[in-house]
């Protein structure tokens, strides 16, 4: 739309000439099918939610840009090893639902890429090597521009306000049990960008199973 509202697939439409600023081209791209691009990011679990003050926990999130269906998994470290494990899990999880992941988009964190590492810039991370082995394209957003991963960023803000504000975790296993329940609720909740279908309903209307 000319005023920047989102269309049914959740992608901002092009602005008019009267708009006082220009959008990045990546923000106007329209996804045509599930799995075409999946946004991935990491959320640090708030300390107040963790029973053990010495423990750190991290929520990895994947969200399909077309259907908005998410996959969540918790880890005890934010590293390229966790990222590589997560991508293997998300590929299998989406595949079981009829989605073949073609491209994964991330920010420039060291858990994903060595792009800005002074000493390892030319060395691929385990995450990047895993993507190559799986035949998945890796797209990096512009540095310091989290809005380019806006769907997963917004989902994290909602998790912070509606999930982490009222839950407590005693281990990483406990986090994953509670994340599974959270995932089921959010994937089955109607969304305005999907014309009030839930991500699961929108997915079922979009995917042809073998």
Please report, for each region that a protein language model flagged, where it lies by residue.
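Acidic/histidine-rich, metal-coordinating catalytic segments
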Residues: 97-119, 142-144, 197-199
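Mobile genetic element proteins and their domesticated derivatives, centered on retroelements
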Residues: 41, 62, 68, 87, ...
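Short small-residue beta-strand/loop micro-motif enriched in glycine and branched aliphatics
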Residues: 69-73, 139-141, 165
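RNase H-like polynucleotidyl transferase catalytic core
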Residues: 105-108, 120-150, 168-170
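Short, solvent-exposed loop/turn segments at secondary-structure boundaries
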Residues: 51, 74-75, 115-120
């Amino acid at each position: 739309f000319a005023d920047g509202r989102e269309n049914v697939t959740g992608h901002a439409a092009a602005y008019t000439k009267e708009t006082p600023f220009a959008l990045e081209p990546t923000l106007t791209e329209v996804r045509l099918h599930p799995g075409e691009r999946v946004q991935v990011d990491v959320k640090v679990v708030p300390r107040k939610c963790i029973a053990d003050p010495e423990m750190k926990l991290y929520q990895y999130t994947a969200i399909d840009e077309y259907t908005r269906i998410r996959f969540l998994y918790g880890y005890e470290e934010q590293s390229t090893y966790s990222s590589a494990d997560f991508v293997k899990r998300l590929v299998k999880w989406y595949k079981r639902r009829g989605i073949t992941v073609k491209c994964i988009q991330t920010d420039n964190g060291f858990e994903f890429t060595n792009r800005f590492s002074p000493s390892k810039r030319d060395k691929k991370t385990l995450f990047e090597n895993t993507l190559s082995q799986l035949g998945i394209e890796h797209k990096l957003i512009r540095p310091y521009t989290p809005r380019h991963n806006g769907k997963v960023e917004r989902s994290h803000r909602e998790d912070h306000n509606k999930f982490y504000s009222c839950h407590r975790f005693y281990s990483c296993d406990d986090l994953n049990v509670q994340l599974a329940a959270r995932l089921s609720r959010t994937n089955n909740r109607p969304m305005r960008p999907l014309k009030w279908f839930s991500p699961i309903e929108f997915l079922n209307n979009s995917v042809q199973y073998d």
